[in-house]
Amino acid sequence: MKIEAVPGAPQDGEFEFVLAAEKEFEEIISISHGIYGGLDYLPSRYHSWINEKDRMVVLAKKDGTVIGLLSVFVVDGGETALLEGLRVAPWERGRGVAGVLQRFCIKLVKHRYPSVKVMRLTRDDKLSAKELTKYRVIAKQGILLLSFNAPDLASRLSSIPLPPAASRPPPPIELTPEDVRDVFLERGGLLKDLLPNQTIIQDWQPFQALPGNQDLLRRKTLCWMVDDLIQPQVATLCTAPFPVPAGPLCFYLNIDVFGSELQSVQEQLLSHLHAHVPKLPADVRCQLFLPPNLWRPMADFCTLVLGLHLEKGYTEQYLLEADI
């Protein structure tokens, strides 16, 4: 779908910018091979993204061929533009396509949504000195990437050796829709002491704990857990598993962790695994985003106690912000 003329947008005769449609799906998948180490979420989300309210999925084309994609999602009551899903065709990488596409998308979102004040994005690689001057770092989390075979783990979950019940924290509490509503009170409500900058980071997507984001997150299939309803020290947010290109029948399980009480994090991880693993058919990539100081003890727990495979060493997720 053609995009209207956007005042101030980059003018480059080489590129045509259009809104993505169903017909471009296969072409986009063909330029996405190897993206995000086989954990690319776009194949599972593309069809809903192109129809989602307040989201624009913008394609860059050259000679009629798709060479780049970037999604812009307006959240936080119309004040924030989330930049997601960036990719450039392999033969065009290193030629400035990503920068041109990002600049166009920023002009487009400001043209359509004048209330937008900042852009936010998440990254999982080291930031250059130039990037550190361009963006504010709003939050930093450790990334723990694990893998396992679901039927194998399901057969072992009930027999995993754990400390005696008397020395373990109380069982995790799954939040009801009414409890979740309390998360979106002023300054994060129930979770105000746990959220980085009052921001809920859900599977790479940052949302401020504002009433305007409540319905948006309620539409997702999420499981929220806390260790205590009055004064939680740990909260976790698990996204429903979805298929990824890492392998045949491979599913991705994402768990975002807020809080640093180790035993409560372990208990909540086990509860999420009990809920999802028995329903999955084969291999799983499980990614936990957690406070950096928890990475090593949780890596040891997952490998030595749960018998999961550590896919890679310590890396970090950065939540970045810039005024626009």
Swiss-Prot record:
Q: Which Gene3D superfamilies match?
A: 3.40.630.30
InterPro entries in UniProt: Acyl_CoA_acyltransferase, GNAT_dom, Hisat_C
Molecular functions per Gene Ontology: L-histidine N-acetyltransferase activity
Stated EC number for the protein is 2.3.1.33
- Gene that encodes the chain: hisat
Q: What's the superkingdom here? A: Eukaryota
Spell out the protein name for this chain. Answer: Histidine N-acetyltransferase
Reactions accelerated catalytically: L-histidine + acetyl-CoA = N(alpha)-acetyl-L-histidine + CoA + H(+)
For this protein, the record's Pfam families field holds: Acetyltransf_1, Hisat_C
Domain N-acetyltransferase, residue spans: 15-151
Keyword line: Acyltransferase, Transferase
- The leader peptide range reads none
What PANTHER family does the database record attribute to this sequence? LOC100145250 PROTEIN (PTHR47403), N-ACETYLTRANSFERASE 16-RELATED (PTHR47403:SF3)
